[in-house]
């Protein structure tokens, strides 16, 4: 095949979609599996960890280090029962969450790190954490989320003003030592449509002003007593709202954030969003999420920058998959997964692609994150639905780390892999006639980290030189007529 190639820029979606992958309710699932199940990468993958290095039992997970039969609520341990952040002061960057952060970035996604942290740690700890993140490109850091609540350990050991002041302190450290990182302030926002202020608004006003991103967590329905009881009608450990009410409350929160910031807007996200199948049943759960996303699409104001689906695989009923109780390495697909897959393949939630001029080789690709990347696009005319469609990365091309997209379906090529079979695209959506299709290639960092090249932009941008196009094999007939 004689092919031409053009530059292509990947920019932000009208509303970005992020995905939770691991929390107190479930373990991390590798990005190869998630990509195969959902057919596209996300803007960011949300990883949830805690940092309480001054506590007894650290760095053991709280439910292991402080195991007790008397515990009757998920947050009853001395510190938060997330997996523990192994970085920080005297940390180990070969452990969690860094192994997962590299996996996330190799697959063309940004890192969204949630960290609950003891407000009493010194600046030395905060500086170490900030430095941990400098090689991971455009990181979003959600510090002590749901900070106007009462369940997390940082709220139990500090006043709300102290929690808010700590947020501002940590934000300033991040800006000085890791300018590639954006901070997310996640508080309760407007929780009653008749409220004129947000909960603990006075305490958090300064944090609202300094943060990079505003956020609220909203579960349309939630069984917060899980896993210690069963949600039954009339019970006291769950609640149920409507998609419309939840959407209105989130939008009212955004408007109040703007008011507190002198009318100046900032990006607004919902860092945890779902309906709990424990309350609704799994089929209605899927319907509710579709309804909520329809509200996002239909709102002309487009005030929401993105949301995080909580989560991919869950031990309860808050996941696209439920963890198989017989084997935690296996996920049981829920009705929500197919509904969510349809949602994220809607153009409204997909990154915007802009084709540029024809390129000549060698060509340099730039990865500035999932919302700012420059790749190449190869137009290919197909006479009819193919029987074979393969992309070969030979010689020096085999070393590359590549994300590819054709007909809205994404594929990953890891370093040293030489052939990617594109045919799943055409099994699922066969062509009925000849058509020109486009193969897009992007090059996220080879090992998931940016290299300090000494350039001014190294914390944000990673560059990859491609010497030539990969070989494309298309056949319209079987190898033999057997």
Give, region by region, the residue ranges found by the protein language model:
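Substrate-binding cleft/loops of secretory-pathway carbohydrate-active enzymes
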Residues: 31, 190-215, 280-284
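Active-site groove signature of glycoside hydrolases
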Residues: 130-160, 184-190
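N-terminal carbohydrate-binding/catalytic regions of secreted carbohydrate-active enzymes
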Residues: 18-133, 295, 299-301, 312-315
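Glycoside hydrolase catalytic-domain groove-lining segments
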Residues: 63-64, 68-82, 91, 219-279
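Aromatic-rich peripheral "rim/lid" segments of glycoside hydrolase catalytic domains that contact
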Residues: 299-413, 434-436, 446-482
């Amino acid at each position: 095949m004689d092919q031409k190639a053009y530059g292509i820029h990947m920019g932000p979606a009208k509303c970005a979609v992020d995905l939770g992958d691991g929390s107190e309710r479930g373990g991390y699932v590798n990005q190869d599996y998630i990509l195969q199940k959902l057919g596209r990468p996300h803007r960011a993958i949300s990883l949830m960890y805690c940092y309480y290095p001054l506590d007894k039992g650290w760095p053991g997970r709280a439910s292991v280090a402080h195991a007790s039969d008397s515990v009757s609520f998920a947050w009853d341990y001395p510190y938060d029962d997330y997996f523990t952040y192994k970085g920080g002061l005297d940390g180990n960057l070969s452990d969690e969450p860094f192994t997962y952060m590299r996996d996330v970035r190799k697959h063309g996604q940004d890192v969204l790190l949630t960290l609950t942290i003891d407000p009493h740690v010194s600046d030395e700890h905060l500086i170490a954490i900030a430095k941990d993140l400098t090689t991971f490109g455009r990181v979003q850091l959600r510090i002590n989320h749901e900070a106007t609540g009462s369940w997390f350990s940082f709220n139990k050991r500090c006043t709300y003003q102290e929690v808010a002041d700590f947020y501002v302190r940590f934000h300033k450290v991040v800006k000085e030592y890791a300018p590639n990182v954006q901070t997310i302030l996640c508080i309760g926002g407007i929780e009653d449509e008749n409220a004129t202020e947000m909960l603990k608004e006075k305490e958090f006003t300064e944090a609202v002003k300094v943060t990079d991103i505003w956020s609220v967590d909203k579960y349309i329905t939630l069984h917060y007593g899980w896993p210690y009881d069963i949600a039954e009608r009339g019970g006291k450990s769950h609640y149920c709202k409507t998609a419309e009410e939840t959407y209105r409350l989130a939008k009212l929160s955004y408007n109040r954030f703007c008011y507190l910031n002198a009318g100046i807007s900032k990006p607004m996200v919902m860092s945890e969003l779902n309906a709990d199948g424990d309350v609704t049943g799994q089929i209605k759960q899927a319907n509710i999420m579709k309804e909520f996303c329809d509200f996002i699409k239909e709102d002309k104001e487009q005030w929401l920058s993105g949301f995080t689906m909580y989560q991919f695989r869950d031990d309860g009923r808050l996941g696209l998959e439920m963890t198989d109780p017989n084997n935690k390495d296996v996920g049981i697909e829920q009705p929500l997964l197919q509904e969510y897959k349809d949602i994220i393949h809607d153009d409204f939630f997909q990154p915007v692609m802009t084709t540029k001029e024809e390129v000549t080789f060698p060509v340099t690709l730039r990865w500035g994150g999932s919302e700012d990347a420059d790749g190449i696009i190869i137009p290919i005319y197909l006479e009819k639905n193919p029987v074979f469609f393969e992309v070969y990365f030979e010689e020096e091309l085999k070393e590359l780390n590549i994300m590819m997209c054709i007909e809205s379906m994404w594929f990953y090529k890891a370093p040293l892999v030489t052939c990617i079979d594109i045919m799943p695209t055409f099994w699922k959506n066969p062509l009925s006639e000849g058509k020109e299709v486009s193969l897009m290639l992007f090059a996220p960092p080879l090992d998931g980290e940016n290299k300090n090249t000494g350039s001014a932009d190294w914390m944000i941008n990673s560059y990859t030189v491609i010497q030539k196009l990969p070989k494309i094999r298309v056949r319209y007939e079987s190898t033999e007529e057997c």
